[in-house]
């Protein structure tokens, strides 16, 4: 039996190093209050997308240090190996992997001494508890009354605040009310990507936000380039347009001209000629409906036919 842990340790090191070599993107997760059954469900859900690897911190640090000479970028992972930590080696997009992980949170009761991850409120109304349990409510400062043989909370109250430790009275009361106020699961703390470490919040950034930020940055570069007179790719379209406007103004005010401005300059110098040339073109479409309106006049031929018929009897 004594050799089994050593054998597992020898298998763990090459497996961790192989996963690090094959997966440049890693999610560093905390696994507080996560049970083995819940962890097994996450592994099944991530099959084909990612690999979950847990282990003791000392083993993880030892394995990473052994690989530092070949992969010095792994140094960035060492400070993250603390408390109850685990790695998710991603084959799919890390944001998609995190979404799967977040779907596998389970409700859990509030245990005494546990730090509350969220605020806990008790709503007003009947509790289903008999009057003999009023001591729990009194110890917590919750006002109650007896209605139809059961305890009823008069108004909603905040029982536990986020970050505080759960007291024995609060844990007992929530247990009696059959309330499981907390949800636990793997929590993504950091993202490791080819030697760089980012906060998990980077996974919330969308493609649209990246495009908006890039467009705003390009606009700022163009504005600065134009202000200081320094050419840049972002400012080139604006600079070319402004230069063309300056050339156009120069052509209109001086004898100088170039082919692209020749017709415009002639229009400015002799607007009457262009107005006269444009008048027939504008009148032609207007004359077409008038001609179409006069078309139905041949009905007078019927009257002539009638006169000719009556003249035969004269």
UniProtKB/Swiss-Prot annotation:
Lineage: Eukaryota, Sar, Alveolata, Apicomplexa, Conoidasida
GO molecular function term, any single one: large ribosomal subunit rRNA binding
Region named Disordered: 288-314
Keyword Phosphoprotein: yes
Keywords in alphabetical order: Phosphoprotein, Ribonucleoprotein, Ribosomal protein
Pfam families, A to Z: Ribosomal_60s, Ribosomal_L10, RL10P_insert
Annotated Gene Ontology cellular component terms: cytosolic large ribosomal subunit
Sequence ranges of Acidic residues compositional bias: 298-307
Family: Belongs to the universal ribosomal protein uL10 family.
Subunit-structure text: P0 forms a pentameric complex by interaction with dimers of P1 and P2.
Name recorded for this polypeptide: Large ribosomal subunit protein uL10
GO biological process: cytoplasmic translation; ribosomal large subunit assembly
Protein modification: Phosphorylated.
Keyword flag Phosphoprotein: yes
Species annotation: Eimeria tenella
Role summary: Ribosomal protein P0 is the functional equivalent of E.coli protein L10.
């Amino acid at each position: 039996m004594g050799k089994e842990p050593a054998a597992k340790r020898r298998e763990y090191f090459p497996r961790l190093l192989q996963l690090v070599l094959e997966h440049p993107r890693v999610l560093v997760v905390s696994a507080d209050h996560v049970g083995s059954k819940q962890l097994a469900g996450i592994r099944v859900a991530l099959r084909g997308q990612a690999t979950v690897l847990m282990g003791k911190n000392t083993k993880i640090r030892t394995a990473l240090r052994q690989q530092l000479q070949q992969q010095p970028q792994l140094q960035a992972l060492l400070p993250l190996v603390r408390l109850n930590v685990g790695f998710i080696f991603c084959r799919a997009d890390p944001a998609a992997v995190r979404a799967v992980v977040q779907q596998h949170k389970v409700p859990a009761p509030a245990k005494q001494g546990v730090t509350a991850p969220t605020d806990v409120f008790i709503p007003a109304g009947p509790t289903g508890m008999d009057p003999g349990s009023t001591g729990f409510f009194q110890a917590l400062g919750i006002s109650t009354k007896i209605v139809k043989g059961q305890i009823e909370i008069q108004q909603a109250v905040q029982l536990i605040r986020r970050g505080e430790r759960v007291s024995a009275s609060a844990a007992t009361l929530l247990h009696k009310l059959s309330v499981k106020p907390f949800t636990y699961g793997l929590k993504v703390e950091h993202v490791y990507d080819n030697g760089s470490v980012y906060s998990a919040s980077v996974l919330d950034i969308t493609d649209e936000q990246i495009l908006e930020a890039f467009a705003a940055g390009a606009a700022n570069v163009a504005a600065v380039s134009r202000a200081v007179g320094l050419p840049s790719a972002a400012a080139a379209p604006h600079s070319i347009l402004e230069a063309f406007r300056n050339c156009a103004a120069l052509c209109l005010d001086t004898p100088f001209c170039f082919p692209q401005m020749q017709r415009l300059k002639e229009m400015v110098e002799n607007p009457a000629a262009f107005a006269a040339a444009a008048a027939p073109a504008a009148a032609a479409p207007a004359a077409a409906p008038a001609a179409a309106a006069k078309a139905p006049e041949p009905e007078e031929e019927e009257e002539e036919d009638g006169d000719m018929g009556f003249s035969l009897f004269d």
